[in-house]
Amino acid sequence: DLSNLLSRVPNERSN
């Protein structure tokens, strides 16, 4: 869960 949140947060910023 935590890993998923952290993974999607920077993913949006990178996108």
Curated annotation (Swiss-Prot):
Keywords: Cell wall, Secreted
Protein's UniProt keywords contain Secreted: yes
Chief place where the protein resides: secreted
Localization of this protein: Secreted, Cell wall
Highest taxon in the source lineage: Eukaryota
GO cellular component, one term: extracellular region
Protein's UniProt keywords contain Secreted: yes
Name of this protein: 46 kDa cell wall protein
Organism (species): Daucus carota
